[in-house]
């Protein structure tokens, strides 16, 4: 995005200082415009008032214009019906970690939480031509979590919840506290032209200073008919992830810098739940490392061990369900550690002896089709429980639930010239189009 000139920065400063001299909420017909209060004051009450006045009226508009920055000092739910929320400016979440840990909305998955819920129907959230959006103040959270996985209390900045027939577009999410976007219990949602960037600047967080775990770009959960197009993601975790009961999903034109790429999962974590992921198309995706984070994989599938060991978020397992009717097309790889793989031995209890449960999963993967995948792998992954999986493709399916109907067409993945191992590993997998274990 083009940086503002010195003149525009000066204008911004003047507008910010003068904000208190003009009404912070102005209404003109069915359009409500919010001007920030400034001086670190909470803008949530005025934003919610604008939504009440203009966001629930047919044809209504709530406008948060550029170049303003709006302070989000408390959780908020914006309920929109037949209206538009235009975010030309930036929603900046406060640095009050104690508040967010204790007051964010709870999410019914892995004891997670969110800071901003968007609910309703037939609405548009638009960042405009310069991509307004969100600043999650994420560095505070990356340092606070200090490399821990799924640390309780880190809220997601954008939570599309119980929404139908909605479009979110032209949005930038910088430094998200946790996952950038969660689409949850929703249907017929279009998300187009997003930029997500999670970058750690604190070298004390990990030896390499690269830690940006749990900063997914977007996750879908209990949602149907979701379209994700024209995304750029830079971070350290899944760019796009499909959680349980994500159906009829279309993903196209996604560029990924760093992290594990496109993820199906995690799935089967809860023994009392059935997780279904079905009818998913992923097309035209490019993946490569960022300046800070390796590219772990291009596309991968992950289900939990088949016994319930430990408790969520990092333990669990024994759940049921299936991934079915998936098409992955036109995947371009650059310097990817493990381009394509299936993992049915998932647990985040790394200090435990999980290898004894690696063939216990009854979660099913079937009818998965891969076409036109090219680029290079690094053959550097060695940390799968009890195995070296330095391959281009590793399909590690459970003995209790073999993977069936996996097809590959036009696959061209090169490995380093000095690599002498196998290129493809198949365990308990019915595969067509690839020479298994060769």
Curated annotation (Swiss-Prot):
Q: Does the keyword Disulfide bond apply?
A: yes
Output the Gene Ontology cellular-component terms: extracellular region
Annotated signal sequence is: 1-21
**Active-site residues (renumbered):** 237
Record keywords: Carbohydrate metabolism, Cell wall biogenesis/degradation, Disulfide bond, Glycoprotein, Glycosidase, Hydrolase, Polysaccharide degradation, Repeat, Secreted, Signal
Any single GO BP term: cell wall organization
Which Gene3D superfamilies does the entry link to?
Answer: Single-stranded right-handed beta-helix, Pectin lyase-like (2.160.20.10)
Primary location: secreted
**Cell location:** Secreted
Q: Which cysteines are joined by disulfide bonds?
A: 397-403
Q: Where are the PbH1 repeats?
A: 186-222, 223-244, 246-266, 277-303, 323-344
- E.C. number(s) listed in UniProt: 3.2.1.67
Question: A Pfam family name for this chain?
Answer: Glyco_hydro_28
Reactions accelerated catalytically: [(1->4)-alpha-D-galacturonosyl](n) + H2O = alpha-D-galacturonate + [(1->4)-alpha-D-galacturonosyl](n-1)
Listed GO MF terms: galacturan 1,4-alpha-galacturonidase activity; polygalacturonase activity
Question: What InterPro entries is this protein classified in?
Answer: Glyco_hydro_28, PbH1, Pectin_lyas_fold, Pectin_lyase_fold/virulence
Q: Which residues are glycosylated?
A: 28, 102, 111, 197, 245, 253, 279, 325, 353, 372, 388, 418
Which function does this protein serve?
Answer: Specific in hydrolyzing the terminal glycosidic bond of polygalacturonic acid and oligogalacturonates.
Q: Which family does it belong to?
A: Belongs to the glycosyl hydrolase 28 family.
Protein name stated in the entry: Putative galacturan 1,4-alpha-galacturonidase A
Record the organism: Aspergillus niger
């Amino acid at each position: 995005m083009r940086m503002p000139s010195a003149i525009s920065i000066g204008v911004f400063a003047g507008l910010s200082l003068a904000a208190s001299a003009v009404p912070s909420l102005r209404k003109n017909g069915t359009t409500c415009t919010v001007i920030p209060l400034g001086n670190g004051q909470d803008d949530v009450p005025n934003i919610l008032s604008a939504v009440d006045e203009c966001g629930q009226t047919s044809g209504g508009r709530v406008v948060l214009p550029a170049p303003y920055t709006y302070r989000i000092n408390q959780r908020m739910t914006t309920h929109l019906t037949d209206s538009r929320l235009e975010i030309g400016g930036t929603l900046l979440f406060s640095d009050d970690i104690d508040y967010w840990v204790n007051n964010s909305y709870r999410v019914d998955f892995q004891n997670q939480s969110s800071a901003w819920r968007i609910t309703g129907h037939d609405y548009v959230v638009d960042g405009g031509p310069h991509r307004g959006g969100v600043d999650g103040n994420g560095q505070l959270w990356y340092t606070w979590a200090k490399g821990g996985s799924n640390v309780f209390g880190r809220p997601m900045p954008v939570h599309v919840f119980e929404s139908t027939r909605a479009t979110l577009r032209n949005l930038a999410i910088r430094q998200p506290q946790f996952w950038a976007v969660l689409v949850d219990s929703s249907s017929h949602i279009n998300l187009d032209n997003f930029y997500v960037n999670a970058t750690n600047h604190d070298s004390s967080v990990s030896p390499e200073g690269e830690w940006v775990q749990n900063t997914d770009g977007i996750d879908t959960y209990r949602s149907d008919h979701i379209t994700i197009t024209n995304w750029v993601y830079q971070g350290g975790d899944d760019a796009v992830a499909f959680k349980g009961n994500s159906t009829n999903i279309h993903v196209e034109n996604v560029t990924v810098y760093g992290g594990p790429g496109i993820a199906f999962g995690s799935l089967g974590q809860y023994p009392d739940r059935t997780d279904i992921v079905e009818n998913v198309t992923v097309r035209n995706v490019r993946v490569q490392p960022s300046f800070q984070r390796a590219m772990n994989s291009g596309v991968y599938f992950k289900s939990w061990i088949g016994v319930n060991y430990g408790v969520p978020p990092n333990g669990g397992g024994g759940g049921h369900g299936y991934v079915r009717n998936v098409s992955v097309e036109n995947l371009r790889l650059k310097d990817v550690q493990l381009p394509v793989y299936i993992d049915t031995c998932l647990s985040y209890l790394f200090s435990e002896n999980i290898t004894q449960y690696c063939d216990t999963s009854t979660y099913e993967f079937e009818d998965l089709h891969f076409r036109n995948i090219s680029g290079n792998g690094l053959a550097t992954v060695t940390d799968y429980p009890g195995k070296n999986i330095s391959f281009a493709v590793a399909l590690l399916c459970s003995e209790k639930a073999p993977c069936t109907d996996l097809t590959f067409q036009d696959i061209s993945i090169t490995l380093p010239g000095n690599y002498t191992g196998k290129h493809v590993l198949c365990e308990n997998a019915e595969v067509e189009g690839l020479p298994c274990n060769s």
